[in-house]
Amino acid sequence: MNETFSVTDLSSDQDPAVPHGSHSAPLPSSEDLAKYAMTSPLEIGQHLKRIISANVLVTVFSNHGKSFILTKLLAIDLKSGRFAFDAGSSDDANRQLLKSERNVFVCTPDGIKTQFVTGPVQSFIYDGAPAFLARLPPEVVKLQRREYFRIQTPIANPVVCRVHDYPNPDGSAGIVLPIYDISLGGMSLVLPGEIPGMELGKIFRDCSIDLRQVGSLPVEIEVRNKLVMQQKNGHEQRRIGCQFVNQNSRVQNQLQRYIAQLERERRTLLD
């Protein structure tokens, strides 16, 4: 595929704005990501070209994380500083993306987590199909650290996190939340709805996660991000991304055992 493309069929001649500020979710915002960031336009262009060559799926979060599309990067034009990517399968999610001022791109080519942020995008036609155009990001973050490699937990037999010090509205304490995915550094929890007391930065000191054969592990968690996902049945699912804090080596070793077990089970199913 030719890596240059025409932008004469755009609905507007204005360039999408380039965002300012540091990257945030889905990576933990407390992490110092500067040493993992590429800022050279040439280096950024080369890395995005590798993503195109690898033909990997890219998730684009828009509308403050409330909407997302799955896409693939199509082409890069270093001269104009733009790149093109496929439109998503959902018309509503595509409309949300067009209205969004800040969009987060996340993918994992060759096991290397890549994240970058763009400003508004524009719709146009690429090779006869609907696509989007955006300015190249000012920086791209690459992470190859294992604590960010999350693996989804079994759907049929979900594992749970018991947040013993969660204050319920009726004055009681404690809530049990299914774990959607987990890594050495944190996990995503599924909420029963829009519930209070889960503000960003909130820390719960008295939690336990039930990991079946591995056992129950005591953990402390900090709420790092919130996400509303559209499920296949059309219903919304609310999740919070949590980071483990004050984690000791015993808990980390047990987590590593559980994640390795999930990876083995997944490979067995694929064989």
From Swiss-Prot:
Pfam families reported for this sequence: PilZ (PF07238), PilZN (PF07317)
Its biological purpose: Acts as a flagellar brake, regulating swimming and swarming in a bis-(3'-5') cyclic diguanylic acid (c-di-GMP)-dependent manner. Binds 1 c-di-GMP dimer per subunit. Increasing levels of c-di-GMP lead to decreased motility.
Family membership: Belongs to the YcgR family.
Keyword match Transcription regulation: no
Entry protein name: Flagellar brake protein YcgR
Region (Disordered): 1-29
Natural source organism: Laribacter hongkongensis (strain HLHK9)
Biased composition (Polar residues): 1-14
GO (cellular component) term, any one: bacterial-type flagellum basal body
InterPro entries per record: PilZ_domain (IPR009875), Split_barrel_FMN-bd (IPR012349), T3SS_YcgR (IPR023787), T3SS_YcgR_PilZN (IPR009926)
GO molecular function terms noted in the UniProt entry: cyclic-di-GMP binding
Disulfide bonds: none
PilZ domain mapped to chain residues: 144-260
Main location: other
Locations listed in the record: Bacterial flagellum basal body
Oligomer and partners: Monomer. Interacts with the flagellar basal bodies.
Record HAMAP family: YcgR
